[in-house]
Amino acid sequence: MNAGRYRVTVTTDGAPLIQGWWDDEATARRKFASWVGEHGDRPGARVTLVDEQTGVVLTEWPDAR
C-alpha cells in the first residue's frame, strides 16, 4: 500500500504528534489548514506539508521566514 505523495506532520517542540499522507495535493492542503486550526495553539507547534516525491516543503506553519 502506498502511503501517498503528500505528507502533513504536526510536531510539538520537535517531537511528532500526528502525520498523514495523501495522494492529492489539494486534499493534503485542506488537511494542513485543518490541523493548523486544531493543533496550532499547542506550545511549540509546527505543521508542515512535504512533497515526499521531491522532498520539497510546500508550506509550513508558522512560516519559517
Model-found features: residue ranges?
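Short aromatic-glycine-(Arg/Gly/Cys) micro-motifs in beta-strand/loop hairpins
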Residues: 1-18
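A generic structural signal for ordered secondary structure
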Residues: 3-7, 32, 49
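A short, charged, amphipathic alpha-helix used as a generic interaction element across diverse proteins
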Residues: 10, 22-46
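Surface-exposed loop/edge segments in extracytoplasmic proteins
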Residues: 15-20, 55-59
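Short, mixed-charge low-complexity intrinsically disordered segments
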Residues: 37-65
